Amino acid sequence: MYAQPKLTSAEYVQHHMSHWKLNLYNFTFTDGGFWTLNLDTLIISVVLGALFILIFYIVARRATASVPGKWQNAIEMAVEAVDGTVKDSFHGDRSLVAPLALTIFIWVFLMNFMDLVPVDLIPRLFQMGGVEHFKAVPTADPTLTFAMSITVFVLVIFYNFKMKGAIGLGKEVLSRPFGWYLMPINVIFRLIDEGVKPISLALRLFGNLFAGELIFILIALLPWWSQFTLGMVWTLFHLLVITVQAFIFMMLTVVYISLAAESH
């Protein structure tokens, strides 16, 4: 990790916190406000998703019941751990929820893991191709974390309608938690409860990864003789953080869907 000598400390931090942007209104590499697509987030997340699918596909094709290899052992442990977690939290049909939970955990972990890559490495590679700004940690971008949390929110709504029906869900919204006589308050409470879920889910992941990335950038600004020691200490701690955050995102997704799928 090293800082660019031509930039001040503030400029260096700002440079690494800026995205490679595409204006969807006129398709130029400028900031288009709401109509802005962060290309770096899109590229890294898609590449990591494709890598995840490719690795699992290759290991599944080469799987053997006799003497499994290291990759097969690791994937089987991950699958069994996630399936056991889902089984404890979700008591309905797990044919969709278990694969979804596994996908979320592995994909979010891989995106979080990009925070451990030296802060100047990937931006420098893209800079050689003429890209001025490139932010390599997708989960440090709120647009991605909110996109994922909104997708979870849509699944929660789907399971609410699937398990309770429109009439059953309507009765639940109007009558709980204070009974039929306080229907307006019940509706307000329900809207707040459902609205907070995707917001907290997105901000928790974004906040932790954004802070972690910022600390790595600040370490890169320190003298070379202190970068290695502090970088190693923070890397070891942050390895725990990125794993826990991936697990929390997966776990809350399963819990929210489980609550929606419960019929009363």
Swiss-Prot record:
Gene3D superfamilies: ATP synthase, F0 complex, subunit A. CDD domains: ATP-synt_Fo_a_6 (cd00310). Pfam families: ATP-synt_A. The keyword Membrane applies. One of its GO terms (cellular component) is proton-transporting ATP synthase complex. GO terms for biological process: proton motive force-driven plasma membrane ATP synthesis. The keyword Repeat does not apply. PROSITE patterns: ATPASE_A (PS00449). It comes from the Bacteria. Keywords: ATP synthesis, Cell inner membrane, Cell membrane, CF(0), Hydrogen ion transport, Ion transport, Membrane, Transmembrane, Transmembrane helix, Transport. Signal peptide: none annotated. It is found in: Cell inner membrane. It is a multi-pass membrane protein. The chain crosses the membrane at residues 39-59, 97-117, 139-159, 205-225, 239-259. Its main location: membrane. One of its GO terms (molecular function) is proton-transporting ATP synthase activity, rotational mechanism. HAMAP family: ATP_synth_a_bact. Belongs to the ATPase A chain family. F-type ATPases have 2 components, CF(1) - the catalytic core - and CF(0) - the membrane proton channel. CF(1) has five subunits: alpha(3), beta(3), gamma(1), delta(1), epsilon(1). CF(0) has three main subunits: a(1), b(2) and c(9-12). The alpha and beta chains form an alternating ring which encloses part of the gamma chain. CF(1) is attached to CF(0) by a central stalk formed by the gamma and epsilon chains, while a peripheral stalk is formed by the delta and b chains. Key component of the proton channel; it plays a direct role in the translocation of protons across the membrane. This is ATP synthase subunit a.
